[in-house]
């Protein structure tokens, strides 16, 4: 399990003395690896000592300077495939990281734009991107996001998270990315696509069973 945080540029630069110790506290208390988004070059070196995985958001996956700066920290880099990219285009993204001396790369599938306010998950993208030699992660909650679907904010269809999670694990992935909250409808962000915390155990149990079956049969 990996827990996710979010570092905004304003918080990181202006108030990092207060914000960054939060990551240290999470690691100490929960004793699991910590992952966080980064949004600009300056954040990479600042955040890296406090986390285990630097995450490149989907919309920033083609920002060469950000990819290089993240790579130079030598941390594990989880780069999300842009909703606007074909899966075979991700080889160019990962090459920028590896050419910078870092092969600790994860690639995340999080859906593809399909008209207005919706995404679809093309499971073919998983084996296609896996051919590049890096572990593939499936982001089950952002894949059901409806960008701008509620007018002034994004919507989501959390009822499909479990279905897509099971499908991705059956195809074969290294990890599943799931956002959860004890009260998703009142979460600060991404609530409509989050899995309620009380339902997480059952979902994890399902996907672990499928994963064991897939690995047993060497799929």
Predicted segments with their positions:
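A short acidic, helix-capping loop that chelates divalent metal ions and anchors anionic groups
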Residues: 9, 147-148, 185-188
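Alpha-helix-loop-beta-strand connector modules within alpha/beta enzyme cores
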Residues: 14-35, 70-76, 126-136, 164, ...
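Short acidic active-site motifs
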Residues: 43, 65-66, 125
